[in-house]
Amino acid sequence: MEQEQDTPWTQSTEHINIQKRGSGQQTRKLERTNLTQLMDHYLRTMNQVDMHKQTASWKQWLSLKNPTQESLKTRVLKRWKLFNKQEWTN
C-alpha cells in the first residue's frame, strides 16, 4: 500500500489522532508546526497566484492588435501607476 505524502491536511489529521491518545505537550508542539506549515503553504500559493496574474496581464497587453506607440505608452503608465498604488497599500 502506498504511503501518503505529508500535506497540511494529513498533518492536521495526525494532530487530531495524537490529541486523542494523550500527551498535551506533544500536541501543542505539533499544532504550532502545523500552523507554520499552513502559513507557508498559503504564502507560496498566493505568490503563485500573483505571478499568474502578472503573466496573464502581460500576455493580454502583448496581444493588442497594431498598438501605436502612444497607446502603448498610455497603457504602460496606467499599469505602472496601478502597480505602485498596490505596492503602497500592501
UniProtKB/Swiss-Prot annotation:
UniProt-annotated stretches for the region Mitochondrial targeting sequence: 65-87
Site positions for Low pathogenicity: 66
This protein's GO CC annotations: host cell cytosol; host cell mitochondrial inner membrane; host cell nucleus; membrane
Keyword ATP-binding listed: no
Subcellular location: Host mitochondrion inner membrane; Host nucleus; Host cytoplasm, Host cytosol
Region (Disordered): 1-28
Keywords: Apoptosis, Host cytoplasm, Host membrane, Host mitochondrion, Host mitochondrion inner membrane, Host nucleus, Host-virus interaction, Inhibition of host innate immune response by virus, Inhibition of host MAVS by virus, Inhibition of host RLR pathway by virus, Membrane, Modulation of host cell apoptosis by virus, Viral immunoevasion
The keyword Acyltransferase is annotated on this UniProt entry: no
A GO BP annotation: symbiont-mediated suppression of host cytoplasmic pattern recognition receptor signaling pathway via inhibition of MAVS activity
InterPro entries: Flu_proapoptotic_PB1-F2
Pfam families: PB1-F2 (PF11986)
Signal peptide (residue range): none
HAMAP family: INFV_PB1F2
Family of the protein in this entry: Belongs to the influenza viruses PB1-F2 family.
Role summary: Plays an important role in promoting lung pathology in both primary viral infection and secondary bacterial infection. Promotes alteration of mitochondrial morphology, dissipation of mitochondrial membrane potential, and cell death. Alternatively, inhibits the production of interferon in the infected cell at the level of host mitochondrial antiviral signaling MAVS. Its level of expression differs greatly depending on which cell type is infected, in a manner that is independent of the levels of expression of other viral proteins. Monocytic cells are more affected than epithelial cells.
Subunit structure: Oligomer. Interacts with human SLC25A6/ANT3 and VDAC1. Interacts with host MAVS.
Other comment: Is not encoded in all strains, and seems to be dispensable for replication.
Identification of the protein by name: Protein PB1-F2
Originating gene: PB1
